UniProtKB/Swiss-Prot annotation:
Residues 611-651 are annotated as: Disordered. Pathway: Protein modification; protein ubiquitination. Coiled coil: none annotated. Residues 25-96 form the BTB domain. Residues 211-509 form the NPH3 domain. This is BTB/POZ domain-containing protein At3g44820. It holds the Pfam family NPH3. Belongs to the NPH3 family.
């Protein structure tokens, strides 16, 4: 009786495997230093490769015991043991977990129907088409288990078939076929209720969302995940769904990325965990290949679609932060910065605060943010740099860029500068370069930039007036609000030159406001006078209302005339102070200790406080509010307060 006809048992002794058939072994097969002492007939009758090797060895080797070594056998010794059992007639359980590895081994040994009816390759392909390709869970498990033999599986058509099947299931409504309903471990009644032992429990199955498959494909290796995403792209799956799968995969394997992303609710987590219990053993650390996080980040970046979105921009900023932590290649960082810059108006301050992980002394990576801002500015001038939205609100093409994104980014940059201004190691040139990265038209008001500079001056009291003036020169004082001007005029952290310029432009604002108020009052009075008197009750009420308005406007007009007169008086006092200071400057110009002159934005000169003396200027204007301007013996805070008062129209 041949060994195949007997019920064969395999046992191991050390590093050798033996088959109990009652006959002595006449062939030794070595796989990964493991020896299998077997018999020629069952192996040669099923394996075309071994049959050919045996025929070649008979002409050269006359020994009764034949030894052969199988190099790079797919799946190793454990997989060859399964094939050997099949050759000896033992029943082999083909599952979705060992399907790919057995197929690779059968192809390696050429186990076709030519060497036996219903050979191993035929059985594997039958199981694939009848059971695996129709079931989501089996497809995912088969793909995941193919990682150890992926190099050999590349030559087969099984991997593309599995990926096409998975992509088709993702494109299709899962409730139509029941796959993924069966993966929850429960059955459904025709009405949708969950069945337990055939009994209707009354509980309803939670409907699966569009992201139900994210968790399952996250168990795949990086290479398989990349190939699957590309296959899904060819199937026409929406870019939003693919981006969501990639974001989910990256958060799972990149350290710290999940902390900076929005959390997932418990309900969505339970909805996504379709086959997590079935994959628990297969996805253990021992079975998962070692993950190269830098390669993963670069792979994710290469797969991400060229789209824009609020959560997508947040994810890109998280990737950039992780890239700095891992120390990835500079080209990868540049690509991330450029893609973030093209949608910077969708970012938030929290995501933009990227810590400095290099040897720099600054706490935050200000250079990176500046590069992102410059990418944003350059993208506005190029129509080809405009990224499409994931879900555009309308189908109308955008013909011209809206000024709103520029304003949003300006507010974001000003808030960022106010946040990083407290860093004592932040140099003035960094602040100046970041503030100047945006064009002047981006800021309708400079209040945010003024606030950032004020915080910076407070945390850096050792700065010289020259450094402060260089920073303040970026601001347009005409675009400061009344409140900001009022604060700046009392701010003892600002240089004297800046304070006087702010006071000058504040006066211009007030004069413009007064002129506008007078024009409005005159217009309303003219309209009120021309209203004809009527005899109906409604017209009488309207006439009385206009009479009241006229009286109020007349009172307002008188008050404004008084204010205008007061402004004239202040201007005369201002000119007298200016002439007096010119005389003092001409007298002291010949001395070696002559005071340094400060050129004002409003075209007049003031001596430094350190060179001023209490002389005739104080006496000449002591009875006016301007007298405090020449009182150089007061501290800086008092001087600034007096400057503010001197330009007040109501003091």
């Amino acid at each position: 009786m041949s060994p195949v006809a007997k019920v064969s048992e395999f046992h191991r002794e050390g590093n050798d495997w033996f088959c109990k058939t009652g006959l002595s072994s006449d062939i030794t097969v070595v796989v990964d230093d493991v020896k299998f002492h077997l018999h020629k007939f069952p192996l040669v009758s099923k394996c075309g490769k071994l049959a050919r090797m045996y025929e070649d060895s008979k002409s050269t080797d006359k020994q009764s015991l034949w030894t052969t070594v199988l190099e790079e056998f797919p799946g190793g010794a454990d997989n060859f043991l399964i094939v050997a059992r099949f050759c000896y007639g033992a029943r082999v359980d083909i599952t979705s977990k060992n399907l790919v590895s057995i197929h690779c081994a059968a192809e390696y040994l050429e186990m076709t129907n030519e060497y036996g009816e219903d050979n191993l390759i035929s059985q594997v392909e039958t199981f694939l088409h009848k059971h695996v390709l129709r079931n989501w869970k089996d497809c995912i498990l088969a793909l995941q288990s193919s990682s150890p033999v992926l190099k050999s599986a590349e030559k087969l058509q099984m991997i593309p078939k599995l990926m096409n099947a998975v992509s088709t299931m993702v494109c299709t409504d899962p409730s139509l076929f029941g796959w993924p309903m069966m993966m929850y471990g429960t059955l459904q009644s025709p009405g949708g209720s969950i069945l337990w032992n055939g009994i209707n429990t009354g509980a309803r199955m939670r409907s699966s969302g569009s992201d139900w498959w994210y968790e399952d494909i996250s168990y795949l290796s990086v290479d398989l995940f990349k190939r699957l995403i590309k296959t899904m792209e060819t199937k026409g799956i929406r870019a939003e769904s693919l981006a969501g799968a990639m974001m989910y995969y990256a958060r799972k394997y990149l350290p710290g990325l999940g902390r900076w992303q929005s959390g997932t609710s418990d309900s969505s987590k339970s909805r996504r965990r379709v086959v997590s219990f079935n994959l628990a053993k297969a996805s253990s650390p021992s079975s998962m290949p070692p993950l190269d996080q830098i390669a993963l980040l670069e792979t994710i970046l290469s797969l991400l679609p060229e789209k824009r979105g609020r959560s997508f921009c947040k994810f890109l900023l998280g990737l950039l932060r992780v890239a700095f932590i891992l120390g990835v290649d500079g080209n990868c960082v540049k690509k991330l910065e450029k893609r973030i810059g093209m949608q910077l108006e969708l970012a938030t301050l929290d995501n933009l605060l990227i810590l400095n992980y290099s040897d720099s002394e600054t706490l935050y990576n200000v250079d990176c943010v500046e590069r992102i801002v410059r990418h944003f500015v350059s993208s506005l001038s190029s129509s080809s740099s405009q990224l499409p939205e994931f879900s555009p609100p309308s189908l109308d093409p955008v013909t011209s860029p809206s000024p709103a994104p520029l304003k949003k980014v300006a507010n974001l940059v000003d808030s960022y500068m106010a946040e990083v201004a407290s860093d004592v190691n932040l140099k003035p040139d960094k602040m100046r370069s970041l503030a100047a990265a945006l064009p002047e038209s981006s800021r309708p008001l400079y209040d945010g930039l003024y606030r950032a500079f004020d915080i910076y001056f407070k945390e850096h009291p050792w700065l010289s007036d020259r450094d402060k003036e260089q920073l303040c020169n970026i601001m347009d004082y005409q675009r400061l609000s009344i409140d900001a001007c009022a604060h700046a005029s009392h701010n003892d952290r600002l240089p004297l030159r800046v304070v006087l310029q702010v006071l000058f432009f504040e006066q211009m604002h007030l004069r413009t406001a007064l002129a506008g108020g007078l024009n409005v009052a005159n217009t309303e009075t003219a309209h009120a006078v021309t209203i004809p008197g009527g005899r109906t009750g409604q017209e009488i009420v309207q006439r009385d209302g206009w009479v009241t308005v006229v009286r109020q406007n007349q009172v307002l007009k008188v008050d404004m005339q008084k204010m205008r007169s007061r402004v004239g008086e202040l201007e005369e006092e201002f000119q007298s102070i200016k002439q007096e200071m010119k005389k003092r400057v001409s007298k002291s110009s010949s001395s070696m200790s002559s005071p340094r002159l400060v050129k004002l934005g409003c075209k007049f000169l003031l001596p430094r406080a350190s060179d001023a003396k209490n002389d005739t200027v104080q006496n000449s204007v002591s009875s006016t509010p301007r007298s405090a301007t020449a009182d150089h013996t007061l501290p800086r805070s008092s001087r600034h307060s007096k400057h503010r008062k001197s330009f007040s129209f109501f003091g």
